[in-house]
Amino acid sequence: MVASSFQHHLEPMLTQPIPCQICTYQSHGVNFNVMTCRACAAFFRRSLVCGMRYHCKTRKNDCRIDSTERHFCRLCRFQKCLQMGMKAEKIQQNRDPISSTFPGTSTEPELSEIVDPENEKSYIFHGTLYGFKSLLAEVRYIFSISRNYSDSPLTDLENGFKLITRHQKRRYIDIEDRINFQNLTDFRLGHIKNCATWLTHSSFFQSLTETENLLILKSTWHVWSWLELLSVSVEIFGNQVCEEKIVFLSEKIAVDIVKVFRYILKPLNKQEKRKVEKELNPIFHILFDDVARKLQNLKPSSLEINYMLWQLVWFVAEKVLNEDNLRHGEQYTNQLASDLHNHYKNDLHLEQYAQRVLKMMAIVKSLQKHLMNIHKIIDYADNFCNLFAMK
């Protein structure tokens, strides 16, 4: 059922791209009753939620709104949203999740969806500008790094995991209840680059085309990051993760995620706060009461964590690869399973390990099932940070 649902979301990627009815970049689904890209959907939501009042930058009220323009006039963009039929009541009905489908195979402008920019070129957090081309260049550099691979693919992935976590503190960590907007930007970009670095430790991933690499990264980094963060958090904080919603975000910082979002939502009125909390609470339940608790009970080894991380990646990759790459990917994934078997037999001296594997796959399936919902946490954080920056 999950695979069938995912295939349904994936189908638009295999057909001719449909342009956004507002800006003409590639759309990502129906948002507020109109086929739009993620950026235009986010812009429309912010405009309504904040009651924004715009002025035409040319004072003619007829500015061009399409992919030929680098910076859109906000008034004319909003007017075009209304003219195309975007409905304000859709915010009340379903609190549009910004994107209901997975993005397709990218050209460079679409790749900016990795950082969810408002104008597909750059985005602003509290006055800080970060262009997607800078991030894209960094990711491409990471993908270009040559790795030495061993006869054990799972050990290679573990080495990648050790590399990205090598500077993480294990003691004397501050637990914050609010996040500086610049830090939030840095955290997010750091997780994207960490995921990219880890992926390069897969010999199979490195054999794919750049387009396939970028598509896989773009579609998996957010859920991959949550499993990575929760596994490290449970290792450091134990039961505090489940009971107090404490999550490790970077090398030195952990946060009380509930208090952080309460702080982020503070400028909203009570009604809008309740709406956002109503949507976020089930997602926090999945991450902390389900996934984190299962991790706490399982206490996975480092190799087991890396096996689960790959399963999340393969869940996406097997839907988008051609027949030859799919066959090679299946062989690679089978080799990981063989390495895991050897880990149980030779390292842990377990003769019966089926129950551990079932528990691991239960964690993976929980994250797979709620893949798009988990992405909403990132969308909400970004949207409200952009909202404050505009103010």
Curated annotation (Swiss-Prot):
Main location: nucleus
GO cellular component terms given for this protein: nucleus
Keywords: DNA-binding, Metal-binding, Nucleus, Receptor, Transcription, Transcription regulation, Zinc, Zinc-finger
Subcellular location: Nucleus
Zn-finger region bounds: NR C4-type: 20-40, 56-76
Keyword Ribonucleoprotein applies: no
DNA-binding residue intervals: 17-93
Residue span(s) of domain NR LBD: 146-391
Any Pfam family: Hormone_recep
UniProt keyword Zinc-finger present: yes
Any one GO molecular function term: zinc ion binding
PROSITE patterns: NR_LBD, NUCLEAR_REC_DBD_2
Protein role: Orphan nuclear receptor.
Matches recorded under PANTHER family: NUCLEAR HORMONE RECEPTOR FAMILY, NUCLEAR HORMONE RECEPTOR FAMILY MEMBER NHR-127-RELATED
Name by which UniProt lists this protein: Nuclear hormone receptor family member nhr-218
Species per Swiss-Prot/TrEMBL record: Caenorhabditis elegans
